[in-house]
């Protein structure tokens, strides 16, 4: 079962019909196909249930999960460089002259084409969770670029996708800094022992703390000197641990064992039933966490 490790949260900026049946047809036109002999990379949709289903969408209680697979050919630059150099030296020796830059560029293309069929592939998968109840889309990605690339494929598949990053009324770093400065956190949240502080001025430095008492005088001095808390490790209701960043992303999600074990009574051999139970559990917990976080951070910006 997928347990999201990261969350990039996006708001649907206008009402849009996202029916799983319609999406299934739209995504199938962009389903994943492996790289051909001359492809550097391929991206497409696969079943979120892996080999247990052919369906490209899976829906439970208004929550839809979909999955993107990306295949990239790995061609280490030293290998390309050596192969190209060998070819240049051989041709220059045969023709008794130095090759022009345009000729070398052309040779590089030839080298790439000759190496591609023998290159190894690297695969990665990115899950998206569409919360049709709360009009949110969550991407399990650690970087904004990967999330945006994934949403770009969804937009291409659906024809349009009016989403914007979830934006809060108050700058997140100011709220996080005040929590640490005042040693007071909203109900349900507890401070852990990791943070990042940045100076307001770009050349003012960055401090990364691990295994640190964040309510200590040492941290207070940095805040008094004008540094802002830009990342903060939090515990939510002893159920989920996370690192909240000033861009609103949630990283290094860790679900408590007591939470993950709630569906242990379901036979693991019954993959579909266990998948549904875990998906319902995960999405309900994360939806509650997101709601609490939005409130704790001062509410969502009104567009």
UniProtKB/Swiss-Prot annotation:
GO terms for biological process: DNA recombination; regulation of DNA recombination. Coiled coil: none annotated. It is found in: Cytoplasm, Nucleoid. One of its GO terms (cellular component) is bacterial nucleoid. It comes from the Bacteria. Keywords: Cytoplasm, DNA recombination. Pfam families: RdgC (PF04381). GO terms for molecular function: double-stranded DNA binding. PANTHER family: RECOMBINATION-ASSOCIATED PROTEIN RDGC. May be involved in recombination. NCBIfam families: PRK00321.1-1, PRK00321.1-3, PRK00321.1-5. Belongs to the RdgC family. This is Recombination-associated protein RdgC. It comes from Yersinia pestis bv. Antiqua (strain Angola). The lineage of its organism: Bacteria, Pseudomonadati, Pseudomonadota, Gammaproteobacteria, Enterobacterales.
